[in-house]
């Protein structure tokens, strides 16, 4: 074989997909392939696709079409490949391979087979693989941040969600494996570790016979990483034991990402989340009592089939009452293969859009008020970027998760990828502004 081809990866979708991309990069680099961020210079482009909702599929398809027009050899991986492998091979001649969500660990063999002229379909119908600390990984986040997958797949069957069909049943990693990877990441200079899975509060249920998130957090408390953040916590899994572990483990942030989806029992029942409607209020109250400094992020779906103005009004009241720090709102997207796909009483697009806008308009002053409460405080900020034209630094406090929440704009001297104390001097609806505590002493 002559010179090895150059390969680029285009990552789309969620952070679970990002980790898959990082493992593929790590495997390819270890095998001697050249990796380039510039797709124009690459011989192959791996597009790690998303198929969660219609907008994500459209973005994936647009990317594939653009690369096909550029005559690139395309390897399609991820959820779209798992979902529509036959259609993709039929409609995109430039696709030399499709790779399922449980097959990315074989990427080196797949590329070698395509180099020999084969067109490869590597799709496990029931994905069962989960990467551990021994699989090479080439991180694509900045030096100080890493995502750590504690489990893959999902055993729940929410009516709107296709993910269990695309990523398989839940399979958790042993606590020892997760801690070993966290230690590796700490040695690489990681300052913030974000724990992810489909339902992080269910971690360990398949492996140990009961959820073990509390024990995992306690074990990670011994790792030298200052910030550990939990994403995708199912509300009913926030038991007193888990809340206690969050409270008592110093490097676990009191930040919780809770995908509540709705508040009204009728809609939650239709979503196949019936038990949640009985406990939403109690769990949030219990959280705020046990963790007074807790930062709560949530997401909601508006326009689920059958959602009336009364149901939506219940959601508005719920958001007003609980004063979440951060809220994301999605309009319902009917996904073929899910229980909600052909439900009656569809909500018109314009009504869904109006409800999304009304909910975000309700949340905006709440977010602004939460930020305003930080005025005059000194907050720890992880410095991530520098604006060379202004000399200003950009980072995040513990209140803000990467990419989904706000930023902190910082004046003064600081080092990238370090956590520094910052005095907050101004706020707006979504961001904070300040100067390093050292700079503030000058004034």
From Swiss-Prot:
It is found in: Cytoplasm. Binds 2 [4Fe-4S] clusters. One cluster is coordinated with 3 cysteines and an exchangeable S-adenosyl-L-methionine. GO terms for biological process: tRNA methylthiolation. Keywords: 4Fe-4S, Cytoplasm, Iron, Iron-sulfur, Metal-binding, S-adenosyl-L-methionine, Transferase. GO terms for cellular component: cytosol. Induction: Part of the rimO-crhR operon; upon a cold shift from 30 to 20 degrees Celsius, expression increases to a peak at 20 minutes, then decreases. In a crhR deletion, mRNA rises to high level and remains high for at least 2 hours; de novo transcription is wild-type, suggesting CrhR is involved in wild-type regulation of mRNA levels. The rimO-crhR transcript is processed between the 2 genes by RNase E (rne). It comes from the Bacteria. SUPFAM superfamilies: Radical SAM enzymes (SSF102114). It is an enzyme of class 2 (transferase). The keyword Iron applies. This is Ribosomal protein uS12 methylthiotransferase RimO. It comes from Synechocystis sp. (strain ATCC 27184 / PCC 6803 / Kazusa). The gene is rimO.
């Amino acid at each position: 074989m002559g010179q090895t081809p150059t390969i680029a990866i285009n990552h789309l979708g969620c952070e679970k997909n990002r980790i898959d991309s990082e493992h593929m990069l790590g495997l390819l680099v270890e095998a001697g392939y050249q990796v380039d961020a510039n797709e124009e210079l690459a011989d192959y482009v791996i597009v790690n696709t998303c198929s969660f909702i219609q907008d994500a599929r459209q973005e994936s398809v647009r990317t594939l079409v653009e690369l096909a027009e550029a005559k690139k050899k395309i390897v399609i991986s991820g959820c779209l490949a798992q979902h529509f492998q036959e259609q993709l091979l039929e409609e995109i001649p430039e696709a030399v391979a499709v790779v399922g969500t449980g097959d990315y660990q074989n990427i080196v063999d797949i590329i070698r087979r395509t180099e020999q002229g084969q067109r490869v379909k590597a799709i496990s119908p029931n994905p069962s693989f989960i990467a551990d600390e021994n699989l090479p990984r080439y991180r694509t986040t900045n030096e100080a941040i890493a995502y750590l997958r504690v489990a893959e797949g999902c055993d729940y069957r929410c009516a709107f969600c296709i993910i269990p069909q695309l990523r398989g049943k839940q399979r958790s990693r042993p606590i020892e494996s997760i801690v070993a990877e966290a230690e590796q990441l700490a040695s690489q200079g990681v300052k913030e570790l974000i724990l992810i899975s489909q339902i992080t509060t269910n971690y360990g249920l398949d492996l140990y016979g009961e959820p073990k998130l509390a024990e995992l957090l306690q074990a990670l408390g011994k790792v030298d990483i200052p910030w550990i953040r939990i994403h995708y916590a199912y509300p009913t899994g926030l038991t007193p034991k888990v809340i206690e572990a969050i409270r008592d483990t110093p490097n676990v942030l009191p930040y919780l990402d809770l995908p509540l989806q709705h508040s009204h029992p009728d809609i939650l029942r239709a979503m196949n989340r019936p038990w949640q409607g009985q406990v939403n209020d109690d769990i949030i109250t219990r959280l705020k009592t046990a963790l007074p400094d807790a930062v709560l992020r949530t997401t909601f779906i508006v326009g689920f089939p059958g959602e009336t103005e009364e149901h939506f009004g219940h959601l508005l009241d719920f958001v007003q009452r609980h004063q979440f720090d951060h809220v994301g709102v999605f309009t319902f997207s009917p996904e073929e293969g899910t229980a909600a796909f052909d439900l009656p009483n569809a909500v018109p697009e314009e009504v869904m859009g109006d409800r999304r806008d009304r909910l975000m308009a309700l949340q905006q002053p709440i977010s602004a008020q939460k930020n305003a409460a930080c005025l005059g405080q000194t907050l720890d900020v992880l410095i991530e970027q520098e604006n060379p034209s202004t000399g200003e630094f950009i980072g995040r406090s513990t209140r803000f998760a990467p990419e989904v929440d706000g930023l902190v704009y910082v004046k003064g001297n600081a080092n990238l990828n370090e956590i520094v104390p910052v005095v907050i001097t101004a706020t707006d609806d979504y961001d904070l502004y300040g100067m390093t505590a050292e700079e503030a002493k000058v004034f």
